[in-house]
Amino acid sequence: KIGFSGFSDLKIEIAKEDFSQKKEHPTSVKYYDEIANNLTEALYSTIRLLDEEKLNEAIKMITQSKNIYIFGVGSSGNTSLDLENMFLRVGVQAKAVLDPHFQSQVASLLTVNDLVIIFSLSGKTKDTYDSLKIAKKNGAKIIAITNYIHSPIGKSADLVLQTAIEEFLNGGSLDGKISQLYICDLLVHGYEQNNNIDSVELREKVLRSIIDKSID
């Protein structure tokens, strides 16, 4: 193990070394340009990995499901909430579940008519993986949105939509978030088009409910 307690420690050290080398050899690119370049690269890398057939199948699974739950923890949990809100605006009532214990409880009550969408950039988030196994045991369908299709979560899912971030340490970065949100937008707009949803009318209803909450 060369002085490391496990493979995870080795991966982290390699990532840190790569990160340190970039800091020791700065380029002439200004930091705001570098951030923009990183976000653009994350987006286009995800586009290059896109499998249109799998995307259409995922949209079909969403359409046919009775109940939809979205699992994620940490930064992926925040993306789960984003997708819940995006779905609501096209009339899909999905529920984001961020707490690992509650994920397990929800998973234990799922059936073959239900769908779980899982966010995990690493594909190795233990709590989420444990809940996935419970959901699978009960016959629920699983869509995984992850950076690694051969990860435990990726291999256990019925369908994988792949994101792309360059560095191991970027898991909680905006790069990863952009990749995930791009996939979210594809799912929502695809559902909207395939089901002839009048999104203007729905968004008007949502907007009116928000305006009614405002104090004059």
PLM segments and residue spans:
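A short, charged, Gly/Pro-tolerant segment at domain boundaries
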Residues: 197-216
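Surface-exposed charged/polar residues within alpha-helices that form helix-capping/stabilizing sites
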Residues: 45-48, 60, 108
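Glycine-rich phosphate-binding loops that contact phosphosugars or nucleotide phosphates
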Residues: 63-182, 186-195
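Glycine-rich phosphate/diphosphate-binding loops that line cofactor/substrate pockets in enzymes
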Residues: 53-65
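Short acidic/histidine-centered micro-motifs embedded in hydrophobic/aromatic stretches
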Residues: 13, 17, 61, 205-209
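HTH-adjacent hinge/linker in prokaryotic transcriptional regulators
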Residues: 1-54
